[in-house]
């Protein structure tokens, strides 16, 4: 017959949740960093294309 398990303590539950949140925050910060880096590279490429078009005209 199934017996209910003991309840997980609040501190243990919060500890696990905080560990998960730290992992998610770390991945989100990395994704944001990569997105900003790509955006800056894109802007640099557009600026160099505009400069080369002005000099060739």
UniProtKB/Swiss-Prot annotation:
Belongs to the bacterial ribosomal protein bL32 family. Transmembrane segments: none annotated. This is Large ribosomal subunit protein bL32c. GO terms for molecular function: structural constituent of ribosome. HAMAP family: Ribosomal_bL32. Pfam families: Ribosomal_L32p. It is found in: Plastid, Chloroplast. Its main location: plastid. One of its GO terms (biological process) is translation. Keywords: Chloroplast, Plastid, Ribonucleoprotein, Ribosomal protein.
């Amino acid at each position: 017959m199934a017996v209910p398990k003991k309840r997980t303590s609040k501190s243990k539950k919060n500890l696990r949740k905080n560990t998960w949140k730290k992992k998610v925050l770390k991945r989100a910060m990395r994704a944001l960093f990569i997105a900003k880096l790509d955006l800056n590279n894109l802007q640099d490429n557009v600026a160099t294309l505009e400069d080369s078009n002005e000099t060739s005209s």
